[in-house]
């Protein structure tokens, strides 16, 4: 996903 890690 893209939110806390900006890459997941």
Curated annotation (Swiss-Prot):
Its main location: secreted. Coiled coil: none annotated. Expressed by the venom gland. GO terms for cellular component: extracellular region. This is Toxin To29. It comes from Tityus obscurus (Amazonian scorpion). One of its GO terms (molecular function) is toxin activity. Keywords: Secreted, Toxin. It is found in: Secreted. Disulfide bonds: none annotated.
């Amino acid at each position: 996903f893209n939110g806390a890690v900006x890459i997941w």
